[in-house]
Amino acid sequence: MIKNPKVLILTAHYGNGHVQVAKTLEQTFRQKGIKDVIVCDLFGESHPVITDITKYLYLKSYTIGKELYRLFYYGVEKIYDKKIASWYANFGRKRLKLLLQAEKPDIVINTFPIIAVPELKKQTGISIPVYNVLTDFCVHKIWIHREVDRYFVATDHVKKVMVDIGVPAEQIVETGIPIRSSFELKINPDIIYNKYQLCKNKKILLIVAGAHGVLGSVKELCQSFMSVPDLQVVVVCGKNEALKQDLVGVQETNPDALKVFGYVENIDELFRVTSCMITKPGGITLSEAAALQVPVILYKPVPGQENENAMYFERKGAAVVIRDDSEVFAKTEALLQDDMKLLQMKEAMKSIYRPEPADHIVDTILAENHVEPNHIPIKSPALAQSFT
C-alpha cells in the first residue's frame, strides 16, 4: 500500500487536448486527496527547439501540410515496429531519468504517446506502474508498449482494435476521455441565454474557429448564415485576435444575428444552448460535445487522428463531415432545418458519452495501487450554484 503517492503526469503541447487531459486528471487526483501531483511536458523540457519546430509543422498540417501529415501518421504506423521505436524510445530519456531520480514518483501517467518510461522499465527493470490515457477515438501503435500496465480508452471500438493488435483485453479499460468537470454539471440554461444575449426561440449555430486559423472562410460563412431566418450565429475565436476584430465589423451590421467572442473560459455554457456546432474533430472537443449531446459538423479533418475521429462519429450518426469549403453552408443550413436529424444526432452523442471518465481513471489507478481516496469537497462554479 502507498500511503501518500506521488503522481507524475507526462504530456505534450501538440494542440491543447493532451495538456487539458493532464490538468483534468491532476485536478481529479487532488480532489481525492492526492496532493503530490506533477504535470510535465517532457518533450518540451527535453528538446525545446525540436519541439517548437514540430509543433509549428503540426499546426501547418491544418493548412498546407495535410499530405505530409498523412504520410507521417499512416507511414509511421506501418514501419513503427521496425525503424521508429528505437529512436522514439530515447526521445526525452535523459530528462526523464533526471526527473525520476529527483521526484521518485510512485505512479506515471501518459496523456501523450511517450514511450520513454515503459522503455526505461524494460531496459533497467525499475518497478513503477505506467498508465496510458488515450486522447482520441482511435489508436496509433505509438501508444502501445509491453511495459505499460494499463490503457484507458474512449470506446469499446478502440479496445477491440488494440486487442486485434495484440494488447491483452484485461489491460484495457473503456472509460471515455477525461473532460473538464464543468461539462458534467447540471445547469439551468436560462441564465446562459441572458448572459450571451441569445434567444431561446431561435436556432443557435456555434462556430469554434480556434486560435490557429484552422477553420477557413469564417467571415464569409458568417455573412451567409446571417441571412438565414430565426438563426443566431455564435463564433468563438479563441486567442485569434485578428479574426475577432475582422468579425466585429460584420457583427455591427446585425448584432442580433451574430455574436463574436474571443477566448471563452466557460465554453460549456455555449455548448449547452447551441443547436449544432461547426468545429475540428479533436478528441477532447468531441468528448465534450458528447457529454452535452451537441450535434457536430466536422470541418475538413486532417488525415490522421482527426480523420479517424471524424469517421467514427460519422459512422455513429453523431456528426456531419465537411470535406470541401463549398459544402459548409448548404449542409449546415439543411441540418439546422431538420429537427428529426438533430434529435437523432443528439441520441447518437448520448450513446457515445461515458460519464465521469476522469473519476473512473483515477479511482482505478488508486485502487490498483491500494490507495484509499480522501475526497476533498470542491465548490461548484457560480453558475451551477444558482440552481439546485
UniProtKB/Swiss-Prot annotation:
Main location: membrane
Superkingdom of the source species: Bacteria
Entry's EC annotation: 2.4.1.315
Catalyzed reaction equations: a 1,2-diacyl-3-O-(beta-D-glucopyranosyl)-sn-glycerol + UDP-alpha-D-glucose = a 1,2-diacyl-3-O-(beta-D-Glc-(1->6)-beta-D-Glc)-sn-glycerol + UDP + H(+); a 1,2-diacyl-3-O-(beta-D-Glc-(1->6)-beta-D-Glc)-sn-glycerol + UDP-alpha-D-glucose = a 1,2-diacyl-3-O-(beta-D-Glc-(1->6)-beta-D-Glc-(1->6)-beta-D-Glc)-sn-glycerol + UDP + H(+); a 1,2-diacyl-sn-glycerol + UDP-alpha-D-glucose = a 1,2-diacyl-3-O-(beta-D-glucopyranosyl)-sn-glycerol + UDP + H(+)
SUPFAM superfamilies: UDP-Glycosyltransferase/glycogen phosphorylase (SSF53756)
Annotated localization: Cell membrane
Listed pathway(s): Glycolipid metabolism; diglucosyl-diacylglycerol biosynthesis
Alphabetical UniProt keywords: Carbohydrate metabolism, Cell membrane, Glycosyltransferase, Lipid biosynthesis, Lipid metabolism, Membrane, Transferase
Gene Ontology molecular function: 1,2-diacylglycerol 3-glucosyltransferase activity
Catalytic class of the enzyme: transferase
Entry's Gene Ontology BP terms: enterobacterial common antigen biosynthetic process; glycolipid biosynthetic process; lipoteichoic acid biosynthetic process
Cited Pfam families: Glyco_tran_28_C, MGDG_synth
Family per similarity comment: Belongs to the glycosyltransferase 28 family. UgtP subfamily.
Protein task: Processive glucosyltransferase involved in the biosynthesis of both the bilayer- and non-bilayer-forming membrane glucolipids. Is able to successively transfer up to three glucosyl residues to diacylglycerol (DAG), thereby catalyzing the formation of beta-monoglucosyl-DAG (3-O-(beta-D-glucopyranosyl)-1,2-diacyl-sn-glycerol), beta-diglucosyl-DAG (3-O-(beta-D-glucopyranosyl-beta-(1->6)-D-glucopyranosyl)-1,2-diacyl-sn-glycerol) and beta-triglucosyl-DAG (3-O-(beta-D-glucopyranosyl-beta-(1->6)-D-glucopyranosyl-beta-(1->6)-D-glucopyranosyl)-1,2-diacyl-sn-glycerol).
Xref: PANTHER family: MONOGALACTOSYLDIACYLGLYCEROL SYNTHASE (PTHR43025), MONOGALACTOSYLDIACYLGLYCEROL SYNTHASE 1, CHLOROPLASTIC (PTHR43025:SF3)
Protein known as: Processive diacylglycerol beta-glucosyltransferase
Native species: Bacillus anthracis
Gene symbol of the encoding locus: ugtP
